[in-house]
Curated annotation (Swiss-Prot):
Keywords: Signal
Organism: Archaeoglobus fulgidus (strain ATCC 49558 / DSM 4304 / JCM 9628 / NBRC 100126 / VC-16)
Superkingdom: Archaea
Name of the protein in question: Uncharacterized protein AF_1994
Region forming the signal peptide: 1-29
Length: 236
């Protein structure tokens, strides 16, 4: 049933290049954790240090990498360098990953404050940007991104999924409700329905059925690939 490791493990080494950003100045404050240095303005020192540690752990940088952090109003902006030189080079899977990361950074670093993640070239030119869209809950290494449902339901979902895959398996799952139906959207490591084996189909169908008891309502499980496209759906 498991679709593979979390999407970041497939793309980070290919798509992120540890690099020094043009635009970092001595006038900014800075903090370094591991190989990650955050240059920041108008942000508390403690927040910058937590962000540096979080991104170092998330990306596992092995060479010195510069991150820019600033704040406008109540929104934090985080500029992250990449090896890309134009927006057309950025793969859809990376955009999906970044959208989820924005929600995690919002909750795990900035306590739910609005966050804008900006992917940039080494010259600090913007490639694309995304804001946090979801609240976030987790159990083990199962990450549930939710909106339109309460946190308790998201926690119940995370715990159920963690009981299936174990505490060390990384899994990203979107959780929403529409017209009285719970939509559970796990990311899986397949590209289309032809790659589903009968055993996988049975497992996901069982999941949809069991989740109706866990969540107390109608459930549809939508499998999506790492680019965010639906592969298959199973009704409870």
């Amino acid at each position: 049933m498991k679709g593979g490791d979390k999407m970041k493990k497939l793309i980070l080494l290919m798509l992120l290049l540890p690099i020094s950003l043009i635009g970092c100045t001595d006038e900014e404050s800075s903090v370094t954790v591991g190989h990650t240095t955050v240059y920041y303005t108008n942000v508390p020192d403690a927040k910058a240090e937590v962000l540096a540690g979080y991104l170092q752990e998330e990306f596992g940088f092995t060479s010195d990498t510069d991150i820019l952090l600033s704040m406008s109003g109540n929104e934090y902006e985080v500029r992250i360098p990449s090896s890309y030189s134009s927006p057309s080079e950025v793969e859809e899977s990376f955009k999906v990953y970044f959208a989820l990361l924005a929600s995690r950074v919002s909750e795990e670093v900035f306590f739910g404050s609005p966050v804008k993640l900006v992917l940039v070239t080494h010259q600090n030119d913007e490639l694309f940007a995304v804001k946090n869209q979801y609240s976030f809950e987790k159990a083990g290494r199962v990450f549930v991104y939710f909106k339109g449902v309460d946190r308790e339901q998201a926690f119940n979902l995370a715990n159920y999924l963690e009981s299936l895959v174990g505490e060390n398996y990384d899994w990203d799952v979107i959780f929403e409700q529409s017209e009285g139906v719970y939509h559970v959207v796990p990311f899986v490591g397949i590209n289309d329905a032809s790659e589903l084996t009968p055993e996988m189909e049975n497992s996901y169908q069982s999941m949809a059925t069991e989740l109706e008891d866990v969540l107390g309502g109608d459930v549809v499980v939508h499998l999506v690939n790492f680019e965010g496209y639906e592969v298959a759906a199973f009704e409870g």
